Amino acid sequence: MKWWKLSGQILLLFCFAWTGEWIAKQAHLPVPGSIIGIFLLLISLKFNLVKKEWIQDGADFLLKELILFFIPSAVAVIRYRDTLTQYGIDLILIIMISTLCVTLVTGLLTELLLKRKGSTQ
């Protein structure tokens, strides 16, 4: 039974992603459809159109297995050996700096939201 529940939750998450892709394509937006889908999911959660319990296990599963989604990308990088040889150090620096920036912004926003949530309770 758990397998069916998990599959349904993942399907619901993908429905938001697909809807976002469709909106981005139809409206010719410069924003990736996946971002629009995440925004739609956020709004749906905020206004209780979708309950957290409906997606929690599916989201947890996808996060646990996230590394599997990066394997094809990592393998594809091998095709650009010349570029890596020429710009490898620059690329590593860019990746490290951008990862640091994303981590810092995420941490700051999380702290801000938690403080804000704490002050309203």
From Swiss-Prot:
One Pfam family matching this protein: LrgA
Membrane topology: Multi-pass membrane protein
Protein name: Holin-like protein CidA 1
Family: Belongs to the CidA/LrgA family. CidA subfamily.
Organism per entry: Bacillus cereus (strain ATCC 14579 / DSM 31 / CCUG 7414 / JCM 2152 / NBRC 15305 / NCIMB 9373 / NCTC 2599 / NRRL B-3711)
Stored InterPro entries: Holin-like_CidA, LrgA/CidA
Secretion signal, residue range per the UniProt entry: none
Higher taxonomy: Bacteria, Bacillati, Bacillota, Bacilli, Bacillales
Compartment list: Cell membrane
